């Protein structure tokens, strides 16, 4: 780096600080002419273009800075700086994909913690934008119809592929989650089916099939009490729904058929086992056995209430 080149760079920096960008360009150009092997001069000129919102020119000089930096084995931080600025230029142009590419290149040279955070946030934005761009209710309907055809044929794996695609195309459509839940139940993937039923209900609390399919899934899992509640929720939507009314009756019969067997199955539930291992809950249960009236105080605590309801449904305790 010659003294004359440094002097021109300093003059360029002074002009840059005063936002006299035209003058800054003149001095940086002279510095480059005097010492074309210095990455800093190209980086500085790229910074001027960035401030001028001339982003294409900014990227061009960032690329030149990287090229010169590689040839001269410049400090990796300076190369990373050029790459990061190119990323910023693409971000300003709303080209997040290219921005992220340049930021990753920069991070491969120097792992700046702030840039790591920025990239994570941009990648979230990119994924959200991609999902939004993918949404197409008409194509979702086509995929749903195809899924229904394969479902009727009993080809549930193929039906699932179409239902998955339908959900991606229209993720706010409650009916699609209901259909996929029915398919998952056939495939005996009960937890995923329940998740889809819950999503369906969240999206449209008046769509009765969401509750009925949730109940059907719970019946398949032999969770009679939970299934009964799901059918009862369906009846809140439509009190005259015969499928839900019949479902409640069947659940009551199933619960009455073999209580000891049902209790044994419920005791195998990891959630029930965890509650029974809890020293605090064991103390509460002991209090309840000695003084049944003690339960009233404990029911005021929402967390304990939920645990006691779980134990009641499992047949471990009786509450009236």
Curated annotation (Swiss-Prot):
Q: What happens when the gene is disrupted?
A: Reduced brood size and decreased fertility under heat stress. Decreased thermotolerance and shortening of life span by 68% and 77% at 20 degrees Celsius and 25 degrees Celsius respectively. Growth of gonads is hampered resulting in shortened arms of the gonads, abnormally shaped spermathecae, lower sperm number and endomitotic oocyte development.
Locations of Basic and acidic residues compositional bias? Answer: 242-269
Q: What induces it?
A: Up-regulated by heat stress (at protein level).
Question: What residue stretches are annotated with the STI1 domain?
Answer: 269-308
Q: Which SMART domains match?
A: STI1 (SM00727), TPR (SM00028)
Which one GO biological process term can you cite for this protein? determination of adult lifespan
Tissue specificity note: Expressed ubiquitously in the whole body. Detected predominantly in the pharyngeal muscles, vulva epithelial cells, striated body-wall muscles, spermathecae and intestinal cell ring. Also observed in the tail regions of hermaphrodite and in the sensory rays and spicules of males.
Residue stretches of each TPR repeat:
5-38, 40-72, 80-113, 140-173, 175-207, 208-241
What terms describe the molecular function in GO for this protein? ATPase inhibitor activity; Hsp70 protein binding; Hsp90 protein binding
Q: How does this polypeptide assemble, per the annotation?
A: Forms a complex with hsp-1/hsp70 and daf-21/hsp90. Interacts with daf-21/hsp90 (via the C-terminal MEEVD pentapeptide).
Role according to the record: Plays a role in gonad development. Up-regulates longevity and thermotolerance. Binds daf-21/hsp90 and inhibits its ATPase activity.
Q: What is this protein called?
A: Stress-induced-phosphoprotein 1
Highest classification ranks of the organism: Eukaryota, Metazoa, Ecdysozoa, Nematoda, Chromadorea
The gene name reads: sti-1
